[in-house]
Amino acid sequence: MAFKETTTIPYTPKQVFSGLTNRDFHVYAADAFRADLDEFSVMPHEPTSDDTVSVNIQRTVNGEDFANKLPSAVQRFAKGRVAIEQTEAWSAAADDGARDANATIKVPMAKATATATIKLYPTEDGSGTVVETEGSVKSTIPLMGSKIAQLAEPQVGKFLNGLTKKLEAWLKEH
């Protein structure tokens, strides 16, 4: 099983990418998701359209906030603060502003890793950006890993889609 989410927002790919690589947006999103943004970095610090870009995001969430969505055998692992490590490797922009990224999201507590591709490209009429996210989750916990991955995949897809919706709201304010 894998996840695939597609969202369209009324901003250019350049604006969407600029938001996704902005620390203030990630603070805003972390607050909305009841998480803490522990670390955020973008290399190069002020990317141009010709640059490939690396993004590193470290968040923590309260495990009890989502433990009830996990299988009972795994709920005991979701205690206290749970670290979420996210890295993104973005391509340089195409002439129309489109960009692609390979993203990895790790949750060490669950021995789980999600890999995804993120695509930003202009809508056909140029009125916005289509954000496509597609990927899968693997967990290496013996006997339970496949069940964890199966339950996590839709949640990761929803999280990434929710992040895009938060970006739309944030861009409206900035």
Q: Where would I find each of the regions flagged by the language model?
A:
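Hydrophobic ligand-binding cavity/cleft-lining segments
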Residues: 1-69
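Short, solvent-exposed secondary-structure boundary motifs
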Residues: 28-37, 76-81, 106-112
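Generic marker of residues within folded, mature protein domains
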Residues: 6, 45-47, 78, 108-110, ...
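Beta-strand/loop substructures that line and gate deep hydrophobic ligand-binding cavities in soluble
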Residues: 53-58, 84-153
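Helix-adjacent hinge/juxtasegments
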Residues: 63-91
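Hydrophobic pocket/interface hotspot
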Residues: 16-20, 133, 167
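A conserved amphipathic terminal alpha-helix motif
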Residues: 84, 146-174
